[in-house]
Swiss-Prot record:
Residue span, OBG-type G domain: 160-333
Cellular localisation: Cytoplasm
Positions that bind Mg(2+): S173, T193
Source species: Salmonella typhimurium (strain LT2 / SGSC1412 / ATCC 700720)
Residues that hold GTP according to the record: 166-173, 191-195, 213-216, 283-286, 314-316
Protein name (database record): GTPase Obg
Keywords from the UniProt entry: Cytoplasm, GTP-binding, Hydrolase, Magnesium, Metal-binding, Nucleotide-binding
Gene Ontology biological-process entries: ribosome biogenesis
MF terms in GO: GTP binding; GTPase activity; magnesium ion binding
Composition bias, Polar residues: 129-145
Membrane-spanning ranges: none
Chain's role: An essential GTPase which binds GTP, GDP and possibly (p)ppGpp with moderate affinity, with high nucleotide exchange rates and a fairly low GTP hydrolysis rate. Plays a role in control of the cell cycle, stress response, ribosome biogenesis and in those bacteria that undergo differentiation, in morphogenesis control. Binds GDP with a dissociation constant of 1.7 uM and GTP with a dissociation constant of 6.5 uM.
Name of encoding gene: obg
HAMAP family referenced in this protein's UniProt entry, alphabetically: GTPase_Obg
Length: 390
């Protein structure tokens, strides 16, 4: 199945049903009073995370989702039926962005998580709501309000513990094939990897972590060169980044300059991503003897001003790979995701008609107070003023 990590859709919630103007008329009850019911609320549009999905390709073809309108009110105080909700299923890891305002509505990070993205319109009020002591036959009603309408951008971001980045042909896909059951394509030409892939690294029966492989970066990726930097978003949720460096590039390029290009593109994309823990991993050490590889790796690290630990591996022959994986596993265990970060969600999204219903009822009560006349003044806005005399 084709991997699609972005899609734009239109969601429209259902309109609220209109209120009804009706009066009770039965035998022997000629003046039964108002009995018009309220309309029904419009249906909502929800997002739901589903772990069985892994792409947004369905929403490249189906782009519009509309919830059902609420039914109108009826006589005999019958309230209209509420409109049916619409649920849109997306892969776990999807971020929902309102393209109109630019706000992030939510991150779908857990299976079964639900997010309200468009709220249905409020129901209209029937004339029963407007009766008062001085207005026994109200002919007022209100119509239902329109439902929310939003243009949404869906961004699928892979959920992985470890992210891999580097130049094309640095050996990222070979590494993920060596440590997991994932089988990304491997070849001797640049940009063999065209889409991100995930692999589960099982250290033993109880310990494992997920690693993400993304297409390689080249100079100018931030301006769209190569495959650009749009795949870097898949590393935003990773806890540690493995920066793979080809210690002896076949094209004769300078490994130090290659590493600086990656760091520069990372900083152009996001300062937060550039600040994540990043480990240097020198790959393809099987192409030279051990002493030469160690000397070359040390020289590259010094040229980069690298003061931390670095690793020498050969993904093809799996030399040094197991030790690296155990160190990664230890780091993940010692640095669990903070509860505050895990529970972090965007601020509450405001919907169009959040306060409408409360305002409507307040206006009805206010009108009723205005209609009350205690006969202490000379003015009556409606009805007959009775003057009693002895």
């Amino acid at each position: 199945m084709k991997f699609v990590d972005e899609a734009s859709i239109l969601v429209v919630a259902g309109d609220g049903g209109n209120g009804c103007v009706s009066f009770r008329r039965e035998k022997y009850i000629p003046k039964g009073g108002p009995d018009g019911g309220d309309g029904g609320d419009g249906g909502d549009v929800w997002m739901e995370a589903d772990e069985n999905l892994n792409t947004l390709i369905d929403y490249r073809f189906e782009k519009s989702f509309r919830a059902e309108r609420g039914q109108n009110g009826a006589s005999r105080d019958c309230t209209g039926k509420r409109g049916k909700d619409v649920t849109i299923k997306v892969p776990v890891g999807t971020r929902v962005i309102d393209q109109g305002t630019g706000e992030t509505m939510g991150d779908m990070t857990k299976h079964g998580q639900r997010l309200l993205v468009a709220k249905g319109g409020w129901h209209g009020l029937g004339n029963t709501r407007f009766k008062s002591s001085v207005n026994r036959t109200p002919r007022q009603k209100t119509n239902g309000t329109p439902g929310d309408k939003r243009d949404l951008l869906l961004e699928l971001m892979l959920l992985a513990d470890v992210g891999m980045l580097g130049m094309p042909n640095a050996g990222k896909s070979t590494f993920i094939r060596a440590v997991s059951a994932a089988k990304p394509k491997v070849a001797d030409y640049p940009f063999t990897t065209l889409v991100p892939s995930l692999g589960v690294v099982r250290m033993d029966s109880e310990k494992s972590f997920v690693v993400a492989d993304i297409p390689g970066l080249i100079e100018g990726a931030a301006e769209g060169a190569g495959l650009g930097i749009r795949f870097l978003k898949h590393l935003e949720r990773c806890r540690v980044l493995l920066h793979l460096i080809d210690i002896d590039p076949i094209d004769g390029s300078d490994p130090v300059e290659n590493a600086r290009i990656i760091i520069g593109e990372l900083e152009k994309y996001s300062q937060d991503l550039a600040a994540k823990p990043r480990w240097l991993v020198f790959n393809k050490i099987d192409l030279m003897d051990k002493t030469e590889a160690e000397e070359k790796a040390k020289a590259i690290a010094e040229a980069l001003g690298w003061e931390g630990k670095y690793y020498l591996i050969s993904a093809a022959s799996q030399l040094g790979v197991k030790d690296l994986c155990w160190d990664v596993m230890t780091f993940i265990i010692e640095n669990p995701i903070a509860q505050a970060e895990e529970a972090k969600q965007p601020e509450k999204v405001e919907f169009m008609w959040d306060d409408y219903h409360r305002q409507q009822l307040a206006e009805v009560e206010e009108d009723a107070d205005d209609d009350w006349d205690d006969d202490w003044d000379e003015d009556d806005e409606e009805g007959v003023e009775f003057i009693y005399k002895r």
